[in-house]
Amino acid sequence: MIQTVEEAFHSSEFKLILEQSESTINTNHECGFFYVFLAVAVILFLIQINTIIEIIPSLIATTIRWKESLNLEASSRLSRDRDLVAIFSIIPFCLIVYSYNLYSPQWMAGLGPNTRLWIVIGIFGLFFSIRTLLEHIFKPRRISMKSYKGVVRVAYSFFIILTIFLLLISGGAAIFDMEKESITNAMLWVSALTSVLYLIRKIQILNSCCSFFTGFLYLCALEILPTGVLVTSAVIF
């Protein structure tokens, strides 16, 4: 049967719409685990919202003065609440990293959405676990327990701060309909600046309780090298 040009056009257009709809449905179906983790993150946020509000002033203070990190550790309740919020922040952090391709090496390009999501969660979960383990193994000598807690746990404070910033950027991007590439670049810059400020505060705490050389070796072994390997794996491979 011979179709007119108009009929052929509308027929092709209809098929294209169907294909796009099926593609969207399949993509959403394949990303099912993302929505599961998102629901878990929202529930945890609602449970911890009062705790988050209570610790925010202390978190802001740690960015202004390094001694505030030690003051935070002096309060067992605040430090415990901060640690719990840091653990709960891992899920939303990984979801943002996955959604905006903040960690997207070339070898992950051909993988499915669910596989990439699990890899991102696995890699950052492993990174945080190894880093925490090494910090407890390679404890600098001649350092008080109070100062040591400040050195180790200042990372938790800045991790929460970084996650909050990334969530705010993601929310603002959704409101103002920003391009994904611009959002990704903004998040990378915020991550870099937060990391630099974190290292400065950690160096200041180390300098207050041990020699500069000891503190430098400590940072190289447990901060600079692991983070460098993570960044290199994302850029080169």
Predicted regions and their residues:
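Hydrophobic alpha-helical membrane-embedded segments
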Residues: 27-57, 126, 130
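Hydrophobic alpha-helical transmembrane segments of multi-pass integral membrane proteins
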Residues: 83-100, 125-130, 160-168, 195, ...
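Long, highly hydrophobic alpha-helical transmembrane signal-anchor segments
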Residues: 1-37, 91-111
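Cytosolic juxtamembrane amphipathic/interface segments immediately preceding
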Residues: 18-26, 67-81
